[in-house]
Amino acid sequence: MKPNYFVAYLTANDTPFFHIDYFNWMNMFKHHPGVDHIHLYVAISMVQQFSFFQRKLIEAMMQATAKCKWITLEAVILKPNQGRDFSSLRECLIAMKGLAVDNDFILVRNRSSRGPFKSQWYKKYINQFQSHDNTGLVGSTINLVDHNERGLKANVSHVQSYSFLSTWKHLSALLDNFPGMMASTHLEAVIDGEIELSQRILRSGAHISSLQKPEMILDLDSQNDPVQSQYPAVVAFQDIPIVHRKREPRGLQFWIKRLGYFKLLTFLVNRKLKVKFMDLNRR
């Protein structure tokens, strides 16, 4: 059976204008993903009270999905900030229940990511996922060391969570006690969320890998082999569809494109798409 394709986009309302999210969304709507159709779920952690103005901004930004042939907006989820991106992902997965099945793909990205800047962006993650048997998680990049404030020397390899792809089979298995779902600090989000997510996948018997080092395939045992640190980064950052914000090129074109944010004014006036908000703060 042909799989479905999902995107879970995770952000927060600690900045008033969602300008980074706007450019990320417009890039997804502009560049063809290389798959037939994507179901988009957006989760917004409420760092502060969600204002009427912010609701209207999100509604305006999502108007572009009405014209995008390959993305359907399924829901915008408003949720408490506890658990940060990891509780956000969990809520997106809960919302996908009933539609997603085991072999469906789920691409997860947060506000620290940038892109995509080229077409075939979703397909590239799938290609890496399918290039080796028993894959459970594929990221843009991968890290072999622990957070320096904890400093463990083993069992800490992890896909960096600003952008990664997995399947419903692997992610739904984590729902009952999702990694990082109770995190309240950045350190807890890294250790209990980002690192633990990969470690749970590895403990299930599956493998993790990345687009940057496609031949470095880690399992529970090989993650601690010193030879892994010798794998070169054979894929340049400009060839990775979704990169960390620190890797985004900032030349003249970067600043010219920033002016495109003002196109949002037309979406504010011409709203045709009804956005469905799921406000979990009212439960």
Language-model regions, residue ranges each:
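ER/Golgi luminal nucleotide-sugar-dependent glycosyltransferases, focusing on the catalytic module
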Residues: 1-283
